[in-house]
């Protein structure tokens, strides 16, 4: 009988587990993740109510952490009361980062000036609370790069696909580059190669239920698929999957903290 090789341990650094897409089978989704060697999932908040839901999920189960923030699509909802409500969530031990925040000039679901105000406010909140911040950047490279200059806390560039301007700004502040299922897409054009990113600044994520990786394209994404992202990133960098998986898990623990020692 041959030797059984254990699956590498994995961390899904960005998942919208509170999304209604998971309401019918959330427990089964997490069990599949556990069976696929996913040891921890970071559950992302995108609005105040979504952040509350993410925190509740993380507080109720092992192997889950949460973030709290307002997505650029929802920046128009930012009000004078928002910072205090986010602060209350960020005081919870299961809430490990600010975000998802940032700028999205592709869809412009919120006015750009509102996006910038909300992003700046959340960067300031992260600095005040000494929390890492999860950043969404799409078609807004110059403004994102400018606003990231000098940020004193760890920055995660989620689903990284930006060009050299954001890459160089991220490098200057020691940001983490988190790769999603997009790295598996056949026709995706990368302007910054995954091999350009420092090994100690790599993360992997699903962004579930969105961006299902090959060979799961067309399906609802879920944390158990993060292994496909790890495999693609390892191939792109010419590394062994086991080494890449262990390194990205260690990196996630470094940026998000000891909460990630809790496992599914």
Residue ranges and their predicted role:
Residues 1-264:
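Mid-domain alpha/beta scaffold segments of enzyme catalytic cores
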């Amino acid at each position: 009988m041959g030797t059984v090789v254990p699956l590498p341990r994995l961390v899904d650094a960005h998942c919208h587990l509170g999304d209604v897409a998971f309401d019918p089978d959330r427990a089964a989704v997490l069990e599949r993740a556990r069976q696929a060697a996913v040891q921890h999932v970071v559950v992302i908040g995108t609005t105040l109510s979504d952040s509350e839901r993410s925190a509740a999920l993380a507080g109720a189960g092992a192997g889950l952490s949460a973030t709290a923030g307002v997505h650029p699509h929802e920046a128009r909802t930012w009000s004078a009361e928002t910072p205090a409500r986010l602060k209350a969530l960020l005081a919870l031990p299961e809430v490990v980062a600010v975000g998802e925040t940032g700028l999205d000039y592709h869809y412009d679901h919120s006015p750009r000036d509102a996006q910038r105000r909300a992003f700046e406010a959340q960067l300031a909140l992260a600095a005040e609370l000494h929390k890492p911040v999860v950043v969404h950047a799409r078609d807004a490279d110059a403004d994102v790069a400018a606003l990231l200059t000098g940020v004193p806390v760890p920055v995660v560039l989620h689903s990284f696909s930006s060009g050299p301007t954001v890459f160089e700004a991220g490098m200057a502040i020691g940001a983490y580059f988190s790769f999603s299922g997009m790295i598996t897409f056949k026709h995706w054009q990368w302007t910054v190669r995954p091999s350009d990113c420092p090994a100690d600044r790599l993360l992997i994520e699903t962004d579930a239920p969105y961006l299902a990786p090959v060979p799961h394209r067309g399906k609802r994404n879920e944390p158990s698929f993060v292994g496909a992202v790890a495999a693609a990133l390892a191939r792109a960098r010419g590394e062994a999957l086991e080494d890449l998986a262990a390194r990205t898990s260690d990196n996630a623990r470094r940026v998000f903290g000891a909460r990630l020692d809790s496992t599914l």
